[in-house]
């Protein structure tokens, strides 16, 4: 197959559609077995995180049913560079296989970075931060606007904008989003806060397992300049709760309220004795 070279982003996307068309309904006469040791990963692969559990599931599926879709590579100096299918390649390699079914595409090496970005965007393989960086890279490389990009990859302008805004968050917050410890729903709420409030809220999301709705309520208070318990206050409340729990007291806290359940006279006397010893 000969893909056209030295064209714009729209042509690259068209080329990837051609590759996927070939991949999903490929002619077995045009696919071939390639030694895995001869394949190098795409150096411009935007995807950095690979879920091990998902890879194990894929490996088990390939072991039982075989590799249904070949990977896509291009040839360089008698070796091959991966274009699409890194998860499949990793899974097959984990099974101890020496070869893998591949489709050899005729693609300009200079377009490898863009193809890797587009491949992952179209397959939705990226976490929110990787996706945001991919959008940013494509816009910079091809000098296009958010509106141009939205039209080319068939996404809404709002979706592009909201995703790119994640790159304004603190690096630590971005890492937590990329690792899945903070959801994209949480991330959207955090955008626009100053660094101090962002850090405080991120710590609360992780420490108190706040859902998105709880997070939205806190952000609303911050933006309305309402007082919020600081992290030190929350930490001390948590310690107090742990101490009381150890002595058999049922207690809970919500916002600035701390409630101790004293269901009988014995519990009241026990608490009084504890306080008198202080």
UniProtKB/Swiss-Prot annotation:
One GO BP annotation of this record: chromosome segregation
Alphabetic keyword roster: Chromosome partition, DNA-binding
GO molecular function: DNA binding
A Pfam family hit: HTH_ParB
Domain of life, source organism: Bacteria
Alphabetized CDD domains for the sequence: SPO0J_N
GO cellular component, one term: chromosome
SUPFAM superfamilies, alphabetized: ParB/Sulfiredoxin
Family, as annotated: Belongs to the ParB family.
NCBIfam families attached to this UniProt entry: parB_part
Function: Involved in chromosome partition. Localize to both poles of the predivisional cell following completion of DNA replication. Binds to the DNA origin of replication.
Protein name as annotated: Probable chromosome-partitioning protein ParB
Upper taxonomic lineage: Bacteria, Pseudomonadati, Campylobacterota, Epsilonproteobacteria, Campylobacterales
């Amino acid at each position: 197959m000969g893909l056209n070279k030295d064209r714009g982003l729209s042509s690259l996307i068209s080329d990837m559609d051609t590759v996927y068309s070939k991949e999903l309904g490929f002619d077995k006469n045009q696919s071939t077995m390639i030694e895995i040791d001869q394949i190098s990963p795409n150096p411009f692969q935007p995807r950095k995180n690979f879920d091990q559990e998902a890879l194990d599931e894929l490996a088990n599926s390939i072991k039982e049913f075989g590799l249904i879709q070949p990977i896509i590579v291009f040839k360089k100096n008698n070796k091959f560079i991966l274009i699409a299918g890194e998860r499949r390649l990793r899974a097959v390699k984990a099974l101890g296989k020496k070869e893998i079914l591949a489709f050899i595409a005729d693609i300009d090496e200079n377009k490898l970075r863009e193809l890797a970005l587009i491949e992952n965007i179209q397959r939705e393989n990226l976490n929110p931060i990787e996706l945001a960086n991919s959008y940013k890279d494509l816009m910079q490389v091809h000098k296009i606007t958010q509106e141009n990009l939205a039209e080319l990859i068939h996404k809404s302008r709002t979706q592009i904008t909201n995703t790119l805004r994640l790159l304004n968050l603190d690096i630590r917050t971005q890492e937590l989003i990329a690792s899945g410890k903070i959801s994209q729903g949480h991330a959207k709420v955090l955008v626009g806060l100053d660094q101090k409030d962002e850090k405080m809220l991120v710590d609360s999301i992780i420490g108190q397992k706040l859902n998105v709705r709880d997070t939205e309520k806190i952000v609303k208070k911050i933006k309305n300049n309402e007082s919020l318990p600081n992290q030190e206050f929350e930490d001390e409340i948590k310690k107090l709760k742990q101490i009381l729990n150890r002595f058999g007291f049922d207690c809970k806290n919500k916002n600035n309220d701390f409630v101790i359940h004293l269901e009988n006279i014995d519990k009241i006397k026990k608490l009084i004795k504890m306080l008198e010893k202080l």
